[in-house]
Amino acid sequence: MDVCVFVMTCKDLADVLARLFRRGVKIRIITDKEQLQASGSQIWALMKEGIPIRTNDSSYLMHHKFAIVDGNVLINGSFNWTRQAITGNQENLIITEDKNITQLFMREFQKLWEQYDPNKVADRET
């Protein structure tokens, strides 16, 4: 499962990811660097679980909000992974198994995963 979200403060969603990871599901997460410090951020807990996490290295926002499940299902929309998004906000979320669309998002995730590789960031700074 590849997760690319701007912010993740919903403990329930983070707990689901942690349980899946403990059961052997491969999970990778990309999130916005500044959101690591957001109040209630669950990213640190997921890092402690051992889930690979990468963040952007730019002053610009990594503002995507999508997840790809088993390389077949795309979940995409305005939905931040927060309690407020679940319980109060006006949000949109589309779930599709359209292979053409899902492949586009898989390529975008992989591009960002490679771009945000901490080793490559270190190389650019030297």
What are these regions (language model features)?
Residues 1-52:
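Primarily the HKD phosphodiesterase
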Residues 42, 62-63, 90:
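Residues that flank catalytic or metal-binding motifs in active/ligand-binding sites
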Residues 46-47, 60, 67-70, 87:
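Extracellular/periplasmic catalytic domains that process cell-envelope and extracellular macromolecules
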Residues 7-11, 33-37, 59-61, 73-74, ...:
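Solvent-exposed loop/turn segments at secondary-structure junctions
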Residues 54-56:
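General small-molecule cofactor/ligand-binding pocket signal
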Residues 6, 66, 105:
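Short, structured motif recognition centered on aromatic/hydrophobic residues
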Residues 73-126:
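Signature of lipid phosphatidyltransferase scaffolds
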Residues 65-68, 94:
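Short beta-strand scaffold segments in enzyme catalytic cores
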